């Protein structure tokens, strides 16, 4: 009976050849091994990114509330005083469309969120769509935590991007000081541009993992030069290490305790356990089976103990 691996069943031949060429392997078992190493790395990285997103969005939410709302309020997206009026209007319009036998497609220009921060038209539309989804599920009210948890990571990056358009540099300083209180890099436009560069790299990395794309050639920033794209396993390892450490730097600027918690997490340790040439070779030699990770773990434990 012929044996099929997950890779042979799911991966198109051109993509399979990409892994084969980049990792310089030939046999089916070696290809399966390096592919599984790549997948395990991506899986651990994604969990780290999830932790980062929660920390990042929570801090921005707090900063926006602090700078745009009354004390002890967090309604910078939708005014709490106007929330019920907004829900009622949407409910009426949804009912009217239903009675007319039409689908309901709300136009955000017809609804006022009474936001205390100037959102883009796209963002307003996204929030109106979210509120409509809540209503369809029978919710007549919602919290700002609901909204914060529902929007994409890209929303928070674009929100910071909009700070570039602030007319007064002092406003940029206020926002950056609130969001990254432990930074020592200065709270000006150059600092903001540096943060956005890192965030866009993280977002691109996150999207590649989310779409099951490869993370072999994540670009490495080179000051004053175009990005460098890895061509070997060693270069790939170095590029991923730089990216994850830049993520950790952002978290440290937000809250050093959070960065320490990430460093001590199982996902962080597992990622860097795998992000080694030795681990790559173990997976390559063992077809990426379950024992591959166990061997990597035992090798690391032995080396740590030996030191």
Regions found by a protein language model. Give the residues of each.
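Active-site-proximal loop/turn and secondary-structure-junction residues that shape catalytic pockets
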Residues: 215
């Amino acid at each position: 009976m012929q044996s099929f691996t997950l890779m042979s069943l799911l991966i198109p031949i051109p993509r399979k050849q990409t892994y084969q060429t980049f990792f310089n392997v030939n046999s089916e078992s070696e290809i399966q091994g390096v592919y599984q190493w790549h997948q395990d790395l991506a899986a651990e990285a994604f969990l780290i990114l999830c932790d980062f997103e929660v920390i990042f969005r929570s801090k921005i939410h707090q900063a926006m509330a602090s700078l745009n709302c009354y004390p002890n309020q967090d309604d910078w997206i939708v005014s709490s005083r106007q929330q019920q009026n907004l829900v009622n209007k949407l409910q009426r319009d949804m009912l009217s469309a239903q009675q007319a036998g039409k689908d309901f497609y709300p136009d955000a220009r017809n609804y006022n969120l009474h936001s205390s921060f100037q959102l883009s038209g796209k963002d307003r539309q996204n929030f109106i769509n979210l509120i409509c989804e809540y209503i369809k599920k029978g919710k007549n009210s919602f919290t700002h935590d609901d909204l914060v948890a529902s929007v994409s990571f890209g929303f928070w990056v674009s929100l910071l991007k909009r700070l570039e358009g602030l007319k007064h540099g002092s406003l940029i300083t206020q926002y950056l000081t609130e969001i990254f209180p432990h930074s020592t890099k200065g709270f000006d436009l150059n600092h903001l541009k540096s943060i956005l560069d890192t965030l866009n790299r993280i977002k691109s990395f996150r999207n590649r993992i989310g779409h099951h794309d490869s993370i072999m050639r994540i670009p490495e920033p080179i000051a004053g030069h175009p990005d460098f794209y890895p061509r070997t396993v060693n270069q790939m390892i170095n590029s991923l290490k730089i990216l994850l450490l830049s993520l950790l730097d952002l978290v440290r600027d937000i809250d050093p305790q959070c960065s320490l918690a990430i460093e001590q997490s199982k996902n962080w340790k597992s990622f860097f356990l795998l992000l080694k040439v030795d681990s790559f070779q173990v997976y390559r030699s063992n077809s990426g089976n379950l024992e591959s990770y166990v061997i990597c773990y035992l090798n690391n434990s032995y080396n740590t103990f030996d030191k």
